[in-house]
Regions:
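Cleavable N-terminal export/targeting peptides
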Residues: 1-29
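Outer membrane beta-barrel
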Residues: 21-42, 54-172, 185-187, 192, ...
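Transmembrane beta-barrel strands of outer-membrane/channel proteins
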Residues: 34-42, 80-84, 117-121, 164-168, ...
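Gram-negative outer-membrane beta-barrel proteins
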Residues: 40-50, 86-90, 123-127, 170-176, ...
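Hydrophobic, lipid-facing positions within transmembrane beta-strands of outer-membrane proteins
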Residues: 63-67, 100-105, 151-155, 160, ...
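Repeated loop/turn-to-beta-strand initiation elements of outer-membrane beta-barrel proteins
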Residues: 75-79, 111-116, 160-164, 201-206, ...
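Detector for outer-membrane/organellar transmembrane beta-barrel domains
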Residues: 197-338
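Outer-membrane beta-barrel "beta-signal"
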Residues: 342-344, 366-379
């Protein structure tokens, strides 16, 4: 079995990148695709309050390793994709197991657009702007970036670069709320929309989302009072390219409130690991119905240059300011990274990255250095 696996990897490294075409007659097509992502590295974390340090040898397979099938039958298209670690239906109940990343079908009306139903990325997922590989290719989310993937069941309409979606509100995808609420609650379907413009030298995306949660207050005594938590986010991404595409500059900005309700923004620190750790990842509601809102403003930048067909150099960084009503101080988190992707073949790449992060919580400072390399096989 080991010999077969090594042979398969060698074959993938030797050929250009392409999905495996199972069937194609022009009108109808089926292909298989996938990616396997592993990492190895070293991390060093410092906790300023306890004056302790952590040194970590890092290795593993990333949870966004995946395999999928795409199909097209006339005006109908669809996709089914399995991820190594993916919440499928009710979030945490399947959050550490293999699950469905994509499961959707769409019908095209030609110039009138397309209607999609199923699980796919929401319009506010902002992939393609920041190349950071930390936190499962998280794009500096929590350190100035924005979520690169937010897969939910939804009904989505797409036309001429515009996407409008009604999205399921499965609270298990995000930590939700704490204090004052019963286990139940009433949510409205989350609304998401975006507009994307793309040509060979420019990528622009503007996105926004809104949701709300109503719940009965159960402290100090149960009654019929209701409190409402409003949640929203807006994001802007801009990525022009220069020198016939050899150089690019990405600018990404996001502002939102109470995005814990749907899990697209977070306040974090890094302890010298590939994954980040959350800081107060819930919205609090007091006994009188007062909502302890969590607001975040974030910005990230990336500059990249393709030295040749094999090697690129990328430098990036970001800053996020979190304003949490329940705390007496704000939280500032920032990161910088240097990356040098090496394209061994069309199917295989090595991506070394050096990252420094810092998080400031009143008098508590948390800093980290991580040097890691991702190995990525794609077909």
């Amino acid at each position: 079995m080991k010999k077969v696996l090594l042979t398969l990897i060698a074959v993938l490294m030797a050929v250009p990148a392409f999905a495996i075409e199972v069937y194609n007659n022009g009108e109808n097509a089926v292909d298989i695709y996938g990616t396997l992502r592993g990492y190895i590295g070293y991390g060093h974390g410092v906790d300023g309050v306890s004056d302790t340090t952590d040194d970590n040898f890092l290795y593993g397979i990333q949870g966004n390793s995946r395999i999928g099938v795409r199909l097209k039958v006339g005006n109908f298209s669809g996709q089914v994709e399995l991820g190594a670690v993916e919440a499928t239906l009710y979030g945490r109940s399947t959050g550490s197991n293999v699950g469905l990343r994509q499961a959707w079908g769409a019908y095209s009306f030609g110039n009138a657009g397309a209607l999609l139903a199923g699980k796919t990325d929401t319009p506010t997922a902002m992939g393609g702007f920041i190349s950071d590989i930390m936190d499962t290719d998280g794009g500096l989310n929590g350190f100035g970036g924005s979520t690169t993937g937010s897969r939910r069941f939804q009904i989505q309409y797409n036309v001429a670069g515009l996407s409008i979606a009604l999205i399921e509100n499965d609270m298990a995808y995000g930590p939700g709320v704490s204090y004052g609420y019963t286990d139940g609650g009433e949510t409205i379907p989350r609304l998401g929309l975006s507009y994307t413009y793309k040509n060979p030298s420019l990528l622009v995306k503007v996105a926004a989302t809104y949701s709300a949660l109503n719940g009965t207050i159960n402290a100090p005594v149960s009654d019929t009072r209701w409190a409402t938590v409003h949640a929203f986010g807006v994001a802007l991404g801009l990525k022009p390219t220069f020198m016939d595409g050899k150089m690019w500059l990405s600018v990404l900005a996001r502002y939102g409130m109470n995005e814990e309700l749907y899990g697209e923004a977070k306040t974090v620190y890094n302890g010298g690991l590939m994954a980040h750790s959350s800081i107060r990842n819930y919205v609090g509601v007091q006994a009188d119905g007062t909502v302890d809102n969590v607001q975040r403003a974030a910005v990230a930048l990336e500059l990249g240059y393709n030295v040749n067909d094999m090697i690129a150099v990328i430098v990036g960084g970001g800053y996020q300011h979190s304003m949490i009503d329940a705390l007496t101080y704000d939280v500032g988190s920032y990161a910088v990274f240097l990356q040098a992707p090496i394209k061994i073949s069309g199917n295989f790449a090595l991506i070394p990255q050096f990252t420094y992060t810092g998080t400031r919580l009143d008098s508590d400072n948390k800093d980290s250095l991580v040097l890691a390399m991702q190995a990525r096989i794609t077909f």
